[in-house]
């Protein structure tokens, strides 16, 4: 009932011309592949999509292996502790020398596919989303060192 209620609010916002950001999987990924599984929120919204609304898929690559990901431990990092460590790393690296990672963000209009697969059902729709997110293949974790003055890679 909660998901249906939220989906209705999102559909009404789209009908009113507002932009809405949805994260279909609703969680951090457990691997280098996105897994939508049996989630239903995005499917419910796209199944009732107002005629003039557009769906823009956003694929992000380069974050798997960051201190915010589950790549190292398999568990979600503690937000407060990770945030404090991040502040320490910025200060310890004299702000300008923080090791950086290449992050790619790709936006693509996937309206036609979402409308088509939403009409076919939740599972085909979710498989379509997974195929979009995972099109480049499985992302390998990249563990960067946290201090510019330490030799080697990883942490």
Question: How should these model regions be labeled?
Answer:
Residues 1-18:
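Membrane-interfacial amphipathic helices and adjacent loop/beta segments
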Residues 2-5, 37-38, 124:
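Soluble or luminal CAZymes and related metallo-dependent hydrolases
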Residues 4-8, 43, 126, 130:
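Generic alpha-helical structural signal
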Residues 8-12, 44-47, 134:
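Surface-exposed alpha-helical segments enriched in charged/polar residues
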Residues 18-19, 30-120, 146-153:
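A cross-family acyltransferase "interaction/gating" segment
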Residues 26:
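Active-site metal-binding loops of divalent metal-dependent hydrolases
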Residues 122-145:
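Short, cationic low-complexity segments
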């Amino acid at each position: 009932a909660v998901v249906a209620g939220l989906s209705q609010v999102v559909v009404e916002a789209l009908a009113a011309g507002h932009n809405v950001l949805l994260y279909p999987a609703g969680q951090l990924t457990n691997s280098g592949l996105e897994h939508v599984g049996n989630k239903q929120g995005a499917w419910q919204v796209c199944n009732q999509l107002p005629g003039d609304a557009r769906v823009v898929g956003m694929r992000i690559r380069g974050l798997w292996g960051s201190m915010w990901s589950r790549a190292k431990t398999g568990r979600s990092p503690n937000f407060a502790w990770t945030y404090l460590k991040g502040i320490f790393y910025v200060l310890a690296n004299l702000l300008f020398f923080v090791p950086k990672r290449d992050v790619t963000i790709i936006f693509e209009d996937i309206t036609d596919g979402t409308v088509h697969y939403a009409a076919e059902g939740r599972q085909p729709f979710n498989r379509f989303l997974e195929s979009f997110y995972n099109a480049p293949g499985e992302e390998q974790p990249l563990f960067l060192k946290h201090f510019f003055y330490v030799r080697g890679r990883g942490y």
